[in-house]
């Protein structure tokens, strides 16, 4: 028999009593015969249990990506499609060992049958106009730091309504920094989804690299910096990595296009006016080095992309955030918060949002959004592991401030620490997109439990492996548990996988 891609499709029998109790589930290798031969084809979904809808509709899936890791495991990402259009459903991932055995299948296995209920009647131009109208703006009145503010405008299927939509991504810096995802019905022009995705808390060979020193918020420390000299000025531009690291001064504006690369007449950036920029520049380099040296990830996107930091955002802004392209730091109001670039955990947290964006792409709502926040917190700890707290360095009141977060004791700082405390909040800005910050305390506590059982070094490796290869964009807490178990098994064996399971079960995730 022939398929479009590969010949010889094998149908696999499964062990009995397989439990498909949740929508997004996974299948372990113990449920697959050891002699299965991987086909690198959606037909692999025929190996699923009869209770999985994806089994009967495997022909509706398309392979989006194929990646081989350093263990030789190949990871395939599949997405549901209909009439040539992809959906916004969760992906399905199939993981194949070097000897062509399927070791793991995960994602939303209860999907497959899809019938589009509308037609395309409005133009792309009309859809973009309606997207801007939905946020009270027009394309002519927003400014983007780089290029067109319309970054994506593809037609996909909204899985909830089964309708074709223009999926439009807007990123701009003026009149305020924003990163919107807006879905416009392709027939009626109705807005089906609207969410601001901000994640809060040219080289010239003649230009030479120079060493420099600077002082950040901690005036007692001198930080070594890499800078670039052009003519008679030294700029906070680090060219010692494959990806350029640049630090800009916004001078209290909110439009990143007004940002200027921080410069000085000497290579001593020690005056107080440079402190926020020095911290941002120094810590961005340290985060780059962490991912490069510990996880072999070249910059945040894995491709040597640039890291741009903007300091002095707005006036007394109590925030720092990744906007989908760069990181922006407020100066704090000085009463409650110091400049946000002065905390290595916060810099690590925000830049990890970029790593998440370029890997699992965890959607910023509900449990997947809480996982997004949690993984950013946990890697913030991995990057600065001297304590279990995130953000205490920017709090004027230090440990007494209730707005910091603790991986060890989330409930001490107004976060849930167990599923019994989980809050199902509205998927709105007022509801914190389903309580992503409050509920992230649950996976944070699970991470703490894992670290105490396996140690930091093993835990950071399995967390990165799960993030890069196993988590899907709509992953729930149970999916994260299983993804981390599989990553632990890959790297350290069954005993480590069991300890990961225990760590999550201790917070009520079974």
Swiss-Prot record:
Q: Which organism is it from?
A: Listeria monocytogenes
Kindly state which keywords UniProt assigns to this record, in alphabetical order.
Hydrolase, Metal-binding, Metalloprotease, Protease, Secreted, Signal, Virulence, Zinc, Zymogen
Q: Which Gene3D superfamilies match?
A: 3.10.170.10, 3.10.450.40, Neutral Protease Domain 2
> Has the keyword Hydrolase been applied to this entry?
yes
Query: Which PANTHER family does this entry report, sorted A to Z?
Result: BACILLOLYSIN
How the cofactor binds, per note? Binds 1 zinc ion.
Keyword presence, Zinc: yes
Name the lineage.
Bacteria, Bacillati, Bacillota, Bacilli, Bacillales
Q: Which GO terms describe its biological process?
A: proteolysis
Cited function:
Probably linked to the pathogenesis of listerial infection.
This chain belongs to the protein called: Zinc metalloproteinase
Listed cofactors: Zn(2+)
Give the induction annotation: The mpl and the listeriolysin genes being physically linked, their expression may be regulated in a similar manner.
């Amino acid at each position: 028999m022939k398929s479009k891609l590969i010949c010889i499709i094998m149908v696999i029998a499964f062990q009995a009593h397989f439990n498909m109790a949740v929508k997004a589930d996974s299948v372990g290798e113990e449920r697959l015969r050891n002699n299965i031969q991987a086909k690198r084809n959606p037909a692999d979904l025929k190996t699923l249990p009869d209770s999985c809808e994806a089994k009967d509709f495997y022909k509706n899936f398309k392979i989006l990506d194929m990646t081989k890791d350093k263990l030789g495991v190949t990871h395939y990402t599949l997405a549901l499609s209909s009439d040539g259009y992809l959906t916004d459903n969760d992906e399905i991932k199939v993981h194949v060992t070097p000897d062509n055995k399927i070791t793991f299948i995960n994602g939303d296995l209860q999907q497959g049958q899809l019938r589009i209920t509308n037609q395309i009647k409005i133009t792309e131009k009309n859809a973009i106009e309606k997207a801007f109208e939905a946020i009270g703006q027009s394309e002519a009145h927003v400014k983007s730091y780089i290029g067109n503010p319309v970054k994506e405008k593809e037609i996909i299927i909204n899985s909830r309504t089964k309708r074709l939509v223009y999926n439009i991504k807007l990123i701009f810096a003026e009149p305020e920094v924003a990163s919107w995802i807006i879905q416009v019905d392709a027939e009626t022009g109705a807005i089906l989804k609207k969410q601001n995705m901000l994640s809060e808390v040219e080289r010239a060979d003649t230009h030479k690299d120079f060493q420099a020193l600077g002082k950040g918020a901690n005036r007692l420390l001198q930080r070594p910096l890499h800078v670039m000299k052009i003519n008679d000025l030294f700029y906070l531009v680090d060219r010692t990595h494959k990806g350029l690291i640049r630090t800009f001064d916004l001078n209290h504006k909110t439009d990143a296009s007004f940002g200027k690369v921080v410069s000085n007449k000497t290579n001593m950036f020690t005056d107080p006016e440079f402190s926020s920029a020095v911290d941002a520049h120094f810590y961005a380099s340290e985060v780059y080095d962490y991912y490069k040296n510990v996880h072999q990830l070249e910059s945040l996107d894995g491709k040597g992309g640039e890291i741009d930091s903007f300091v002095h955002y707005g006036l007394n802004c109590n925030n720092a955030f990744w906007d989908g392209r760069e990181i922006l730091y407020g100066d704090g109001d000085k009463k409650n918060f110091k400049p946000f670039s002065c905390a290595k955990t916060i810099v690590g947290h925000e830049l990890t949002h970029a790593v998440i964006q370029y890997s699992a792409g965890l959607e910023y709502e509900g449990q997947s959004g809480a996982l997004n926040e949690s993984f950013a917190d946990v890697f913030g700890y991995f990057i600065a592991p001297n304590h279990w707290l995130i953000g205490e360095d920017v709090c004027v009141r230090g440990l007494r401030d209730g707005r910091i977060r603790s991986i060890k004791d989330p409930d001490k700082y107004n976060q849930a620490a167990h599923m019994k405390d989980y809050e199902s909040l509205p998927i709105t800005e007022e509801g914190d997109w389903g309580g992503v910050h409050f509920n992230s305390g649950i996976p944070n506590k699970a991470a703490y439990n894992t670290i105490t059982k396996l140690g930091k070094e093993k835990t950071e490796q399995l967390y990165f492996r799960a993030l890069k290869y196993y988590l899907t964009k709509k992953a729930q807490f149970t999916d994260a548990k299983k993804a981390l178990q599989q990553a632990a098994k890959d790297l350290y064996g069954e005993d480590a996988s069991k300890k990961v399971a225990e760590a999550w079960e201790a917070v009520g995730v079974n």
